[in-house]
Structures are given as structure tokens and as C-alpha cells.
């Protein structure tokens, strides 16, 4: 009896393995990746606009790169340029107001591995200047985040102070 069951089971499995697999048809139309990215950028812009409105950031202006800047304190002297070594202080927040960190750093503008948005914000600042900058995710840590405190695709707020410019 055991041999007969084994043969029947083996024969059944052999027949089933010969059948063509049924095709699974995805009924949802796939969105074009470019269109999906445009939708994400529009959603992120709404998040930034809501942050500006809820925090009453009067006077904050777009800078032409998709970032928003508000001068808090004017600096003095020459503006920082590409090639200058600058010392700056930054306090970084997610747009839910949770703090990411506060630090002081020295970078050579145009040659350092910092976020594109941070670089753009530092260029043109003067010694002693304080600036609030809202940076979209694509100019911050992008689709990966920083693998620590900044989640993927997160716009950031930077409160910057330029301490020193070395030419």
C-alpha cells in the first residue's frame, strides 16, 4: 500500500510540474517614473510651504535653486566664495521640528563633501551672518537619508552662522 501511495503522489507531482504557470496580470497601470518624481517634488514643495506658513517665516524667499532662505543677522566684510575655507555652525532640523544635530565644521567651498544645499547656502554669506535655510531632500541627503537621523527623502531646516572666512 505504501508503494502505491508513493507512485500516485510521484505521478501527480510530475503532471503538475508539466503544467504551464498561470500568468499573473498586474491590473494597475504603472506610473511613469518621471511623472512619479514630479508628483513627489510637488508633495515635498507642499510640505515646505506648509512649514513656512505654520512657522510664520515672513520674508523667507526662494533662492532660485529650490531652496528657501531667510537672513536673520547680517554679516560684515567680504562674501564667502568658491575656494574659500569657511568655518560655520549649523543646527539642523527635520520639518517636524525634531532636531537632527548641532555642529561646527570647516569646509573648503566647492571642494568639500557636504550637501549641495548646504554648500549653496554658505556661498555668499558674510562673516557673522546668520541665515535660516529650508533645503529640499534632493539638495540635502536625497533618497537614502543619512542612514542615521535623517530619514530618506527628508527636506531639512538649517540654522547657519558663518564664523570665519579664510582666503
Question: What name fits each language-model region?
Answer:
Residues 18-167:
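Cross-family detector of peptidyl-prolyl cis-trans isomerase
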Residues 1-18:
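Sec-dependent bacterial lipoprotein signal peptides
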Amino acid at each position: 500500500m505504501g508503494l502505491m501511495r508513493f507512485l500516485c503522489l510521484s505521478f501527480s507531482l510530475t503532471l503538475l510540474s508539466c503544467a504551464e504557470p498561470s500568468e499573473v496580470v498586474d491590473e494597475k497601470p504603472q506610473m511613469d517614473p518621471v511623472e512619479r518624481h514630479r508628483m513627489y517634488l510637488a508633495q515635498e514643495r507642499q510640505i515646505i510651504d506648509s512649514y513656512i506658513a505654520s512657522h510664520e517665516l515672513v520674508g523667507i524667499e526662494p533662492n532660485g535653486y529650490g531652496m528657501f532662505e531667510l537672513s536673520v543677522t547680517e554679516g560684515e566684510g567680504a562674501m564667502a566664495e568658491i575656494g574659500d575655507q569657511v568655518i560655520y555652525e549649523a543646527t539642523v532640523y527635520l520639518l517636524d521640528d525634531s532636531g537632527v544635530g548641532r555642529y561646527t565644521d570647516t569646509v573648503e567651498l566647492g571642494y568639500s563633501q557636504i550637501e549641495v544645499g548646504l554648500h549653496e547656502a554658505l556661498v555668499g554669506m558674510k562673516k557673522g551672518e546668520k541665515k535660516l535655510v529650508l533645503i529640499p531632500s534632493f539638495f540635502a541627503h536625497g533618497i537614502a537619508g543619512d542612514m542615521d537621523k535623517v530619514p530618506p527623502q527628508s527636506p531639512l531646516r538649517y540654522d547657519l552662522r558663518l564664523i570665519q572666512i579664510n582666503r
